[in-house]
Regions:
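Hydrophobic h-region of N-terminal signal peptides that target proteins for export
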Residues: 8-17
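Hydrophobic small-molecule pocket/channel-lining residues, especially in calycin-type beta-barrels
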Residues: 17-163
C-alpha cells in the first residue's frame, strides 16, 4: 500500500510540472516536420523536453536541406532553453545554433499558440518564431526575420506532427 502511495505522489508531481508550462504545454513532446522558405524545401525533427526537474524546457531541432542548383545539401542544428525569468516569472528563452547565432527571446501567447520574439538593439535584425497548435497531434510554425527598421518577413514556414 505504501508503494502505491509513493507512485501516486510521483505521478501527481509529474502532472504538476507538466502544467507549469502553461501556453507552451502543447509543444512538449517529439515532432517531425516539413517546410520551406528562403533556405529551400527541407525536413527535420524537434523536441521540447522538460529538464532540471521541470525548471527548464529544452528544445532541440535538426533541419536538413537537400542540394539545389544554388547550394549543396546542408544541415542546421539548434538548441533553445526556455525558462521563467526571475522575479517577473515571464517565459523567456535563449537560442544557440550551428551557424553560431545566439538569440534571446521573450515569449508571448498568441491565438492558439506562442510567439518567441527576439530582444536586442534597434540596429540589429529581429526574429520571431511562432508555433500555432493545429490539434493535439499537429502544429504550424513560422520563422520571420525583420532587418533593422523593417517589418517582419517570412523566412520559413512548416508543419509538424507529433511522433
Amino acid at each position: 500500500m505504501r508503494g502505491l502511495l509513493i507512485v501516486a505522489t510521483f505521478l501527481i508531481s509529474l502532472t504538476a510540472k507538466a502544467d507549469d508550462w502553461g501556453p507552451l504545454q502543447f509543444l512538449v513532446g517529439q515532432w517531425t516536420g516539413e517546410g520551406g522558405g528562403e533556405p529551400g524545401q527541407g525536413s527535420g525533427s524537434f523536441s521540447f523536453t522538460p529538464d532540471l526537474q521541470g525548471k527548464i524546457l529544452v528544445r532541440k531541432n535538426v533541419a536538413e536541406y537537400p542540394p539545389s542548383k544554388e547550394k549543396p545539401a546542408y544541415r542546421h542544428d539548434d538548441l533553445m532553453v526556455i525558462y521563467r525569468d526571475s522575479p517577473s516569472r515571464q517565459f523567456r528563452a535563449i537560442y544557440f545554433d550551428s551557424e553560431e547565432h545566439t538569440i534571446e527571446y521573450s515569449i508571448k501567447p498568441v491565438d492558439d499558440g506562442v510567439a518567441f520574439v527576439s530582444e536586442g538593439p534597434r540596429d540589429a535584425p529581429r526574429f520571431r518564431l511562432t508555433y500555432i497548435s493545429a490539434g493535439s497531434e499537429r502544429l504550424k510554425l513560422k520563422f520571420e526575420i525583420a532587418p533593422p527598421g523593417k517589418d517582419f518577413a517570412t523566412y520559413i514556414e512548416a508543419a509538424a506532427r507529433r511522433r
